[in-house]
Every structure is written in structure tokens, then in C-alpha cells.
Amino acid sequence: MAHAARLLAALAALLAAAATGDARPSKIAVVGAGIGGSAVAHFLQQHFGPRVQIDVFEKGTVGGRLATISVNKQHYESGAASFHSLSLHMQGFVKQLGLRHRREVGGRSAIFNGENFVLEETDWYLLNLFRLWWHYGISFLRLQMWVEEVMEKFMRIYKYQAHGYAFSGVEELLYSLGESAFVNMTQRSVAESLLQVGVTQRFIDDVVSAVLRASYGQSAAMPAFAGAMSLAGAQGSLWSVEGGNKLVCSGLLKLTKANVIHATVTTVTLQPTEGKPLYRVRYENEAGTGSDNYDIVVIATPLHLDNSSTIAFEGFDPPIDVVQGSFQPTIVSLVHGYLNSSYFGFPDPKLFPFANILTTDFPTFFCALDNICPVNISASFRRKQPQEAAVWRVQSPQPLLRSQLKTLFRSYYSVQTAEWQAHPVHSPHTPLPRFTLHDQLFHLNALEWAASSVEVTAVAAKNVALLAFNRWYQDLDKIDQKDLMHKVKTEL
């Protein structure tokens, strides 16, 4: 099936070239080898064919925000840890690359407010529903209906992309999915939207805020669209990749036969040419500096004012604008040690029943605490008992102080940290950026200013690949079209 899809994509490229008389691009540059850069390299090759040279520039490690840390001779996820069951692009990558889903190891969750647990999961589904109803009435049902309505509309993007449609800006993409309602959700808070559909303030404070803190490190004041995507992840079944999620990135680059250049891109310059534009990409690494010309350039890394490594754009009139915003720092600490269950109200550690702890607005020094499993799980693997030394993943807005570590752990063997600029600080006042920066210069990460997740980035990668393809062959009927639900129903 995958081979047939690649064959059809290559045939489509040949037909488009024949129809327009345009040759395919000879060289494409992708800046960034995270999931966005890896996925867009794969999609670009699907559309333009295998003869196009694709150079992928990466200043760090392939995988970006998909990464692992070794603790006691085992590897654990330190970046994006899991994916929603409806992550169709990620599901497709895993299947195409011959990877496997990691075996699930069950564990109960709870929400902590700094003094006690406001909500505790049990092993019985009906009892969990009863507790939600007893504490919050039907707020959880109203939340579920609201999230499902958003997700049902968002899932339209896969059908649009299957028919070759692309969007030059984030606002155009959102409008195609949910019209003005989706665009307005980027300008209105989660709390405001949920109160409007009858969710209680108490449920927002206790449950919704805890989920948003764990996923985004932000509050219910964040925009509703990003919040809905985050809350969808909390409701669906989750999965991860056996051996580590970053294998998807390295696998896609290997499948694409992309030329990975370990270097920092410093400048993209528009070259004076006749006809289609040409872009000169300058870069530097330990070997020195270099540059090359490209027909298409995709920036698959954040571009915003607070980013000290933002690329300089030269020769463009008007100048290239970067996003007027900042990113939310998230510290992930992997602690190998003994949990201080007394802090959570369990003097006897043997009685502590939870593997995952979310927090409300208090305590402020950590957002979530998880007893995590390694990326490779054997058939005989079992989760550590609460009285045993285990590897705990602590998410916090700042590096944990020694006193804070002593609050959470009776003792510990090691602490290893990863600091991420994990997500944009989502604000109703941040304007929605565009994917198209210039004729054949694109910013893949534009979409994460509306919502940020691995699958959303993969959706953006597919959109940018289609956008580049459609613009190259001037197939403008496939760009920024409205009423697409009607159009795709009438297409063969």
C-alpha cells in the first residue's frame, strides 16, 4: 500500500510537470531534523519524486523534541512521551517504517493540589465515572462533547490533504476546518469557552487546569483551540514507539535518503534570478562555514523574537517577519530514587497507588510527576512498586532545587535533566502566522502557534509539502480553497 502511494505521488509529479512544462526542483533545503523536518523531507520526496536532492540541516541531534535520556543503562523518553490514537500521520509513519507500538504498562493517575488529592483514579471504570459525577456533575460529559466536536472537525484535514489541498496561512487552514468558530477559538480562553458550554469553574480549576499544566505548562487562560487539542490527548488512548519515539525521525530521513548536514543555518538570502527564485543558505559548523543554492527552503524550527538562534533573512522586500511571541520553557528531570509518599499523604510507601500525578495551580514548583517505563519493554517487565527505587519523570517550569527534590523524594541515586523550549506561550493576542514566507520559502512551525503537538507538526509538514508542490507547478486551485467539504465529496 505504501509503495503504491509513493508510485501514485511520483506519477502525479510527472503529470504536473508535463502539464505546466516546469521541471522539478533540483535541490531542497530543510532546516531542522525534528519530527517536522523529518516528516516534510519524506512528504516532499513523495510529491516531487526520488530524484530531488533534499538537504536537512540540524545543529543538534536528529529527533529534536523527540529525545531520550539514559538512566541506569536504560533509555527513557525525555521529550514528547506519547501520541493520541487519532494521530494518523504518526500511525502511518510507524507502519511504513516497520516500527512497533510499545507495550502498555498500566498505572493509576491522580490530581494533587498541594495538600491532598482532589481526584483519584481507580481500577474500576464505572467507579471513576461515578466519582466524576459526584464531584463535578455532568461537567466531564460536557467537556467530552466539546472536545469531540473540535476533533471531529480537525480530522477533516486528513481528507483535504489526501486530495492535495494546502493552505498558505494558519488562519486559512483553521477556517477550512471549522470556519470562524475555529479561528475565534484562538482568540478566546479555554476557561471562557468551557464555561459557555456549561462546564463548572470547579471542574476547570481541578481537572482542566491540571491537564493543561501537564501538557503545556500553561493555565486555562490559554486559547481554546490549543486547549482542546491538549484535552483530546488526555481523553483518548495513548501510545508510543518501541525503542523510542525519535526512531520515527531517523527512520523517515533514512527512508527519504536525505542528506543530513550537522550545521547551524545562519542566513537565507534571496538570489537575483529570472523566473523562479533561488535561495542561498549559509551555515556553519566545526569544520567552518559553507553555503549552497536551493529552489525550495523549508524552515522546520521555531522562528520568533525570543529565539537567539533565529535565522537572518536577507534580500527580501518586504522583509520576512518573525512571530511576535515567546516559548514556554519546560524542564524534564529524570530522577532515579525513592518517592517521598508522605508528601502526598501516604506515610507508608507500600500503600501509595499512583503512577501519574498531575497538579492544579499548586504546588507551583512542579507540573506533573510520572513513574515512567523504559523505551524498550520486555515481556517480563513490571512497573516498580512504590516502595522501590524507580525512575520518575518530573516536569517543572524551572530547574528543581535540592530542597524541592528532597520534598518529592526520600532519597535518590541520580538526577538528569533536559531543558526544552517545548511549546509557544499560547496567547489570544498572538497573531496567527503564515506558512508561506516567500514564493518557495516556508515556515513549517507556524501551526504550533495555534496548537502544539507532534501530530500537529506532522500535519503542518504535510501541508507545507503540498503547498510547495502546488506553488511550484502553479496548481493554485489546490491552495486556500473554501467549502472544501463539498469539493472533496464531488471529487473522485
UniProtKB/Swiss-Prot annotation:
- Give the family from UniProt: Belongs to the prenylcysteine oxidase family.
Write the gene name. PCYOX1L
Report the subcellular localization. Answer: Secreted
Glycosylation positions in this chain = 340
**Taxon lineage:** Eukaryota, Metazoa, Chordata, Craniata, Vertebrata
**Which species is this record about?**
Bos taurus
Q: What GO terms are given for molecular function? A: prenylcysteine oxidase activity
Example GO biological process term? prenylcysteine catabolic process
Q: What is this protein for, i.e. what is its function?
A: Likely to have oxidoreductase activity. Required in the mevalonate pathway to regulate prenylation and enhances the bactericidal activity of neutrophils.
Listed name of the protein: Prenylcysteine oxidase 1-like
